[in-house]
Amino acid sequence: MKKTIMLAVAFIACISIFAQTKDEKYAEDVQSIDAILNAYYDVISGSSQQPWQFERDSYIHSKNAVIIRLDENGNTNPHTLESEYIPMGLSPRQDFYEIELKRNVNHFGNLAQVWSAFEIRTDPNITSDIRGLNSIQLHYEKGRWFIDSWTCEMESEKNRLVSDFLNEN
């Protein structure tokens, strides 16, 4: 009898955990600008043993989010979030940590613009010299924040944008 009751309780607990909607699972990620930016860095970072968090990443972005990368000559490579996932899903995951170094937020009404400097590491505790700057646009709708787009440029020998951004007051 005790075994049956224990199994029933375990079954109900599993159903309630796995039956959560995305809104229930990731609601805290989108309640503030800080929360969504922390989730943004969290979903991309992790060890090679951790699975990609595609569902969570998709949830924090708006449906038609655009990603733009600038090369060292200023040329753009715009694409959708879904096309970002394709190469990630096709190759084995490696240890990768995008660590935020500094954030500047401008927030007016339901709009926000975030400048965020980051460093790419293969170990979260060992600094690296691979750095970049994100420009992230967000909007607030239906009680939550969405990332609409982000543009990234990596620091290079001829463009010290992260150093300049970190040295700003």
Functional labels for PLM-detected ranges:
Residues 71, 116-118, 151:
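A mature extracytoplasmic/lumenal domain signature
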Residues 66-67, 76-124:
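Surface-exposed, charged secondary-structure patches
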Residues 1-24:
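Bacterial Sec-dependent N-terminal signal peptides
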Residues 131-161:
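Short beta-strand edge/turn micro-motifs at domain boundaries
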Residues 48-76:
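N-terminal, post-signal-peptide region of Sec/Tat-exported proteins
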Residues 78-80, 125-128, 157-164:
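A short, polar/proline- and glycine-enriched secondary-structure boundary/capping micro-motif
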Residues 40, 55-57, 65, 114, ...:
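Hydrophobic pocket/interface hotspot
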Residues 19-54, 59, 167-169:
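Short, low-complexity N-terminal intrinsically disordered segments enriched in polar/charged residues
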